[in-house]
Amino acid sequence: MNPVTREQRDEAIAHFKYEGTLVKDCPYGSGHINDTFLLIFEIAEMGRIKVILQRMNSTAFPKPVEVMENITGVTSFLKKKIIENGGDPERETLNVIPAVDGKPYYIDSTGDYWRSYKFITDASTYDLVEKPEQFYESAVAFGNFQSLLSDYPAETLHETIEKFHDTRNRFALFKKSVEEDVMGRAASVEKEIRFVLEREEIANCFAEMLDRHELPLRVTPVSYTHLTLPTK
């Protein structure tokens, strides 16, 4: 995708339901798929609030409308569960800021898709685990997410990236890549390739269990934006 222009960003900002006066906007985070910006607004008597504005990568996610339908469906479900459990839905799940037309996304004049979320303050994200405690807390969060969504109708989610979690298809593509060896690098990783090929049966087991209806569909943090993933 082409770099985001100042004009594009201004257009997107003008088409979301923001309150207050914009005092700052700048690129944010270390993500490499979508283009993310932090916006800071000044609101009388409330001080400054932060929101996230993001241009969605339609190359990586070719069905952005379905992506946002998945997100709004799951986050709405989560909010109800979090409130029932006495939690704080402003901090414990994403909160989508709608566009001025009420949709959870905006399409700019160039055809790019944008979305916006409330910024979660006093929170940290990590590209790499720095200590065991961080890994533990991520597992706790993952488990809590799974628990809250255990009765979510996962079959209602759109599969916006075809066969993304189909391990049989992934393995077939891997073997095809090894055979073609377009870049001539297979010989340098023969040990690693052999390690993977010897475990093809393991790679297929979840898909086969799903085919036999032995494994229910579930939503996961890495997949609810675009598809369902079989997991216990």
Residue ranges and their predicted role:
Residues L39-A44:
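Active-site beta-strand termini and strand-to-loop segments that position acidic
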Residues R55, F61-V65, I120-S138, D151-V222:
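ATP-dependent phospho-/nucleotidyl transfer catalytic cores
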Residues T36-L38, S116, V219:
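Conserved hydrophobic/aromatic beta-strand scaffold that supports enzyme active sites
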Residues K50-M68, K80-A154:
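ATP-binding pocket architecture of kinase catalytic cores
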Residues M1-T21:
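Juxta-kinase regulatory segment immediately upstream of eukaryotic protein kinase catalytic domains
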Residues L22-L38:
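ATP-binding glycine-rich phosphate-binding loop
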Residues N70-V74:
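The N-lobe alphaC helix and its flanking beta3-alphaC-beta4 segment of protein kinase-like domains
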Residues T225-T231:
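Conserved small/polar residues in nucleotide/adenosyl-binding loops
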